[in-house]
Amino acid sequence: MEWLDNAIILELGSFRESDVWVKLLTSQHGVISAFAFGGHRSRRRFCGCLGILNEIQVRVQTSRNGRFLNLQEASLINGPIQLRTNKNRFGAFINCIRFLEVVGVSSDAAPPVYTLMKELFYFFEKNTQPYEIIPILFRLRIASEQGYAPIFSNCAKCGRLINNKGFFGISDGIIVCSICINYIKTPIAIGYESLELLKRVQLASPYDWKLSENTKSAAAQKYECTEIINAFVEYHLGITWSKGRFLKV
């Protein structure tokens, strides 16, 4: 079987003298691994486009025994410039990629995740606003794309609109109001501005994942969102960040 798709290169590795192993996020087939035989040498088939984070168009063929995929040819669509020269941006984007790899992306989930990664790519490539919190917020968005999508606007128990402080129950995966706080275990308080940010993360482009312009409010958003997202992802997806890498727990 053979197919064409667009892809972002997540990882690259070499084996033997001229061959390349690639991990790709594709727009229709999810995250895949493939072999590019002659990838280091063939300018005709790969045009020097096999670079980390490059967006490429690929032609992929299943091997005769059906056990692996061969990258037959590829052409460059777009490549990063700022990402490769700014180590902080590069590190933040790679953190998002490593999380995506651990979660995995099926063919069903591929189209929205691919669109999100392209938006994130352009955000890191061209935007100058603060981005340190983006990898944390990205984890919530990916969890939401996987079906773990808390509703942050209304109390999950009584339905009241939350227009002040809410309380998040990690194991239940829900937000409740102050009246219904006894319905959840170990509630974590979260302010209205943080709730608004989490709603934007679920629905909008990374360009809209902006912290408050007020320094004190922004600090509270960072703390509250980081605490809730990391706990939520660990409990429901079984993934934690430890010693510089993501681990399944």
Swiss-Prot record:
Family: Belongs to the RecO family.
Role: Involved in DNA repair and RecF pathway recombination.
Gene3D superfamilies: Nucleic acid-binding proteins (2.40.50.140), Recombination protein O, C-terminal domain (1.20.1440.120)
Organism taxonomic ancestry: Bacteria, Pseudomonadati, Thermodesulfobacteriota, Desulfovibrionia, Desulfovibrionales
GO annotation, cellular component aspect: bacterial nucleoid
Key words of the record: DNA damage, DNA recombination, DNA repair
Gene designation: recO
An annotated GO BP: DNA recombination
Source domain of life: Bacteria
Record's protein name: DNA repair protein RecO
Disulfide bridges in this chain: none
Pfam families according to UniProt: RecO_C (PF02565), RecO_N (PF11967)
